[in-house]
């Protein structure tokens, strides 16, 4: 375990074409709500949720990035400092599927090879699917990413995506601490550890995340009851 007065904070970016369900996914996970109304994200939005992963308190800071090309310069700037990534495409949007490799390259160019999950959203619309199962699974294998099929509408596998990424980051964090214990106390460290006793971040300052056009909505910390999902994830060995 980490030190008792330390809190892990993980910056996750949710990336993909417009209208694939990125905003809805974050709203569902952080606030437990779903709306059919589509509102284009202007630049970047931000929500957070506090969870426990393997008995560790973890704060997930979820960044919803615009999928339109006109916002590309803005969203790329917000990739910096990200410690995990969700790549999302829609079951009913072939173009969003074909764009995944490009989105992946943009993220890697800014932050390197961080824990990443590939998500096929809107599986409640499988009857209208534009992507074959083997195509989606093949893409995950080529990119060497954990693959999930989700339905934000039905709340299927949404929590599993973020939990997986949190676990992967914690593994990386603990490995870094083992290799260099002093790293968690360095003001230049960027692995996302907060000193809970004084509320200070030892990497990227949380107050700096809320400037400019970012909307900082703090969700109710009430936890929602987990439901058993009939769809399982597909992982790459």
From Swiss-Prot:
Give lipid-anchored residues (S-geranylgeranyl cysteine). Answer: 234
Q: Which InterPro entries match?
A: P-loop_NTPase, Rab, Rab23, Small_GTP-bd, Small_GTPase
- Which residues would be cut away as propeptide? 235-237
Motif Switch 1, chain ranges: 28-46
Q: Where in the cell is it found?
A: Cell membrane; Cytoplasm; Endosome membrane; Cytoplasmic vesicle, Autophagosome
Cysteine methyl ester found at:
234
**Main localization (coarse):** membrane
Q: For the region Disordered, give the residue spans.
A: 204-237
Where GDP binds, per the record, is at: 19, 21-24, 37, 40, 121-122, 124, 152-153
CDD domains assigned: Rab23_like
Q: What happens when the gene is disrupted?
A: Complete embryonic lethality, due to defects in neural tube closure. Mice suffer from exencephaly and severe malformations of the spinal cord and the dorsal root ganglia. In addition, mice display poorly developed eyes and polydactyly.
| Family affiliation | Belongs to the small GTPase superfamily. Rab family.
Disorder association? Defects in Rab23 are the cause of the open brain phenotype. Mice suffer from exencephaly and severe malformations of the spinal cord and the dorsal root ganglia, leading to complete embryonic lethality. In addition, mice display poorly developed eyes and polydactyly.
- What quaternary arrangement does the UniProt entry report? Interacts with SUFU.
Q: Summarize the protein's role.
A: The small GTPases Rab are key regulators of intracellular membrane trafficking, from the formation of transport vesicles to their fusion with membranes. Rabs cycle between an inactive GDP-bound form and an active GTP-bound form that is able to recruit to membranes different set of downstream effectors directly responsible for vesicle formation, movement, tethering and fusion. Plays a role in autophagic vacuole assembly, and mediates defense against pathogens, such as S.aureus, by promoting their capture by autophagosomes that then merge with lysosomes.
Name used for this protein in its record: Ras-related protein Rab-23
């Amino acid at each position: 375990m980490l030190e008792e007065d330390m809190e892990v904070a993980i910056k996750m970016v949710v990336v993909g074409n417009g209208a694939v369900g990125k905003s809805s996914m974050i709203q569902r996970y952080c606030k437990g709500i779903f709306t059919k109304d589509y509102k284009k994200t202007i630049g970047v939005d931000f929500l957070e949720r506090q969870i426990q992963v393997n008995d560790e308190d973890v704060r997930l800071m979820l960044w919803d990035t615009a999928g339109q090309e006109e916002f590309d310069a803005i969203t790329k700037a917000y990739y910096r400092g990200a410690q995990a990534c969700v790549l999302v495409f829609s079951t009913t949007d072939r173009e969003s599927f074909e764009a995944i490799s490009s989105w992946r390259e943009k993220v890697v160019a800014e932050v390197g090879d961080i824990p990443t999950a590939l998500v096929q959203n809107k599986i409640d619309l499988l009857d209208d699917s534009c992507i074959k199962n083997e195509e989606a699974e093949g893409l995950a294998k080529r990119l060497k990413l954990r693959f999930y099929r989700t339905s934000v509408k039905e709340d299927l596998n949404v929590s599993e995506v973020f939990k997986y990424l949190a676990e992967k980051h914690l593994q990386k964090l603990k490995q870094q601490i083992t290799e260099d214990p002093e790293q968690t106390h360095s003001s230049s460290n960027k692995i996302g550890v907060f000193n809970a006793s004084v509320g200070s971040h030892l990497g990227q300052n949380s107050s700096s995340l809320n400037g400019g056009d970012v909307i900082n909505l703090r969700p109710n910390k009430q936890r929602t009851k987990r439901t058993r999902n009939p769809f399982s994830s597909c992982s790459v060995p």
